[in-house]
């Protein structure tokens, strides 16, 4: 297994997870009336593997933290997230993985499609929703004024 990423393999149960980081992500980005249920599902072995479906549409996210993002290839997305956060490691909640991952790998996974939240810490993240028609919804997630927002994100 590539040591640059920790991958949740659903048939192996719950790997070592970072409960504090998961709660932080949910509290910072998810609307209040959905937080408790999602946190419970993340901590439940049987429910954890399907929790990502809560993130299929951006209406579950707090509106004040959403900054629409244009299409970016993996390299550009990594550059933008690194410039804002200064970190090469992130926490990912996605369709096939939940856990710590190198930023480059997380951006490549997002670029391939699929629902995901990439969290770089300090209230900085990226969201990609489910693709129904056209491009999937994509947003930079910025809690408060945690960093300088690039002119084009």
What are these regions (language model features)?
Residues 1-134, 139-153:
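Structured alpha/beta or helical-core interaction and ligand-binding surfaces enriched in interleaved
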């Amino acid at each position: 297994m590539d040591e640059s990423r920790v991958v949740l393999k659903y048939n192996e149960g719950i790997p070592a997870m970072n409960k504090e980081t998961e709660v932080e992500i949910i509290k910072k980005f998810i609307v209040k009336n959905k937080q408790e249920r999602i946190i419970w599902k993340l901590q439940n072995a049987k429910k954890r593997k399907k929790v990502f479906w809560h993130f299929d549409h951006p209406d579950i996210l707090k509106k004040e933290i959403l900054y629409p993002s244009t299409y970016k290839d993996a390299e550009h997305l990594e550059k933008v997230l690194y410039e804002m956060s200064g970190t090469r490691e992130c926490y990912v909640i996605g369709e096939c993985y939940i856990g710590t991952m190198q930023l480059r790998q997380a951006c490549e996974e997002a670029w391939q499609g699929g629902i995901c939240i990439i969290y770089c810490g300090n209230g900085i993240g990226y969201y990609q929703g489910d693709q129904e028609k056209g491009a999937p919804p994509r947003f930079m997630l910025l809690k408060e004024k945690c960093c300088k927002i690039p002119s084009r994100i």
